[in-house]
A protein has these predicted regions:
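Positively charged n-region of N-terminal signal peptides that target proteins for export
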Residues: 1-4
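Bacterial N-terminal signal peptides
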Residues: 6-15
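Well-ordered beta-sheet/strand-loop patches within structured domains
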Residues: 21-36, 126, 148-532
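Cationic-aromatic interfacial patches
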Residues: 22-131
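Histidine-centered catalytic/metal-binding microenvironments
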Residues: 110-169
């Protein structure tokens, strides 16, 4: 790589030195580091060794690439303004701009396809040889066709709300200079008036929940109350219609905070597999919601309960293999120990709930055979509960084997679905209207109509139904979501997982935006290194 291009890369954020003018880094005391070598994993490839294989650049394609790079902020990615300017600068020899374009295109395509940050370590996400080869092949196809736009469009995540979140990002970026704020104070309700009511109207107008036809000084009316209710629904608050303190805190979240949250959520979309499955189930834990999708269409929605903070439900993807109608419940160790204390005081509980107790050899024993003085607080037995009206599994469970031992199931506590916040389980996912979900899961499977499902459930025999076609189950934790109607909702960070993701992504985002070194020493805690 030429010294000229190294200097150009440094100036455009593809190099490591924070040189801010057209100046030889050696004269400025800066060391030119060829940061086209990507950090973190030794099996990540150098971008320059692959980008140099791209050919067919023309002034028109360079102009298109500059426009493509200019869209980076809408994707929550670092701004590429200086790169775009360099690509269009006639003072820079065309051959050098073409070489720069190859590096910029490959890096940006990698960001869109795989992300800027590693999902597990939060270090910089580089490219493996197979990934670089694939992207170079697709980029070369675009160069041969004289059009890079479709190539980059194909790199975008396939989750349905990605474009909705992009539109929200553009809206907030545009509003940032004039973001309305509400003066802190007491709650407001219908009939109140004053400057804070005007501020509330201005803020909800910015949220596109009110038309800008209201009069200054007008009292808090039912129209404003309706807008407040709609806003509260967006942020998962109880829809009281009053400006209470939780609602005020959400309304006064700064645009910078919202932008940081959106950037992290857009990045999380890039971490997800691109092939979700023609038929798949999507669970967003932060939204307490399950969605069943078929051929790109939302087929069903279900409310869910998830694990509490002490037993939080993990994020993962696995394939549903079978369902169980009238399932037994194998008590987890924690539940068994708590039941043990109750049974010690009142052994009749075992018969009341139909529990079965098994010793270490797997033999069933009677509760009256247990020598309580021998075991103290230790519980060496397994416990199971057969199907029935008190079985916490309810009428059906959906099994997608995984290392977390998490599955979806019915519940006997169905009245708790009316709550807004539903973190009541021990880690599994309890679903509302589970037999309707079972009907969808078994749709098209010979012999399994809703009528047959109901007939089986009306009995008491456990019945395992293996799926002819496995169904991917994706469990995510996303605190910003876009609904099918285009509405964006900001959700409560129940598990407090957002903070680290937002902070670590912001650090990388700022570094690659030219606000610091692309791989600064301050990020070494994430395992980053810079190699020549």
């Amino acid at each position: 790589m030429s010294k000229f291009l190294l200097i150009l890369l440094t100036l455009c954020g593809l190099g490591a030195g924070p040189v801010m003018a057209w100046q030889d880094p050696a004269e400025s005391g800066q060391e030119v580091v060829d940061s086209t070598a990507v950090p973190v994993r030794p099996d990540y490839v150098r971008l320059d060794s692959w980008a140099g294989r791209l050919n067919g650049w023309t002034p028109h394609i360079l102009s298109d690439l500059a426009a493509i790079l200019a869209e980076a902020p809408s994707h929550g990615l670092p701004g590429q303004e200086r790169l775009a300017e360099a690509l269009l600068d006639p003072a820079i020899p065309f051959a050098q701009r073409a070489e720069l374009a190859g590096l910029a295109a490959l890096r940006y395509a990698g960001w869109l396809e795989y992300g800027l940050m590693e999902a597990e370590t939060h270090g910089v996400r580089g490219l493996y040889a197979s990934e670089a080869g694939y992207l170079v092949s697709r980029l070369q196809d675009g160069l041969d066709a004289g059009d890079l736009w479709p190539v980059f469009a194909e790199r975008l995540p396939q989750v349905r709300d990605y474009d909705i979140l992009r539109a929200e990002m553009l809206r907030i970026l545009a509003l940032r200079p004039i973001w309305p704020e509400i003066t802190p104070g007491g709650s407001l309700r219908v009939g109140d008036s004053g400057p804070r009511v005007d501020q509330l109207r201005a803020r909800l107008t910015a949220e596109r929940l009110l038309l800008a036809d209201w009069q200054t000084g007008a009292p808090y009316d039912t129209r404003l109350e309706t807008a407040v209710r709609r806003y509260q629904g967006r942020v998962n608050l109880s829809p009281t219609g009053r400006l209470d303190q939780p609602t005020l805190r959400q309304l006064n979240v700064s645009p910078e905070q919202r932008i940081a949250q959106l950037r992290a959520n857009l990045e999380q979309r890039r971490w997800r597999t691109r092939d979700l499955g023609d038929r798949h189930i999507w669970v967003n834990l932060a939204d307490f919601r399950l969605e069943a999708w078929e051929n790109g269409r939302l087929a069903r929605e279900h409310e869910v309960m998830i694990g509490g903070q002490a037993s939080s439900t993990p994020e993962f993807t696995e394939e549903m293999q079978y369902i169980v109608l009238n399932p037994w419940w194998g008590l987890p160790a924690g539940s068994a120990r708590s039941r043990f204390q109750s049974m010690r005081r009142n052994p009749s509980i075992v018969d009341q709930y139909g529990f079965r107790i098994f010793n270490a050899s797997g033999d069933a024993i009677s509760v009256y055979e247990i020598d309580w003085s021998r075991w103290g607080n230790y519980w060496p037995y397994r416990m199971s509960q057969p199907p029935g009206p008190t079985n916490p599994m309810g009428e059906v469970k959906f099994i997608f084997p995984n290392r977390h031992n998490v599955y979806i199931h019915d519940t006997v506590e169905r009245d708790r679905f009316i709550r807004t916040r539903r973190d009541f389980s021990a880690g599994c996912i309890r679903v509302q209207d589970p037999l309707a979900l079972a009907e969808w899961v078994l749709n098209g499977q010979d012999g399994w109509s809703r009528a047959r499902i109901d007939d089986v459930v009306a009995g008491s025999s456990p019945t395992v139904v293996w799926l002819d076609q496995r169904i991917p189950v994706h469990i995510a934790y996303w605190t910003v979501v876009g609904d099918v109607d285009g509405r964006v909702r900001y959700l409560h960070d129940l598990y407090r997982r957002d903070g680290r993701v937002i902070a670590d992504y912001a650090a990388l985002h700022d570094a690659f935006s030219g606000q610091g070194l692309p791989f600064p020493s301050g990020l070494a805690r994430a395992g980053n290194t810079v190699r020549r």
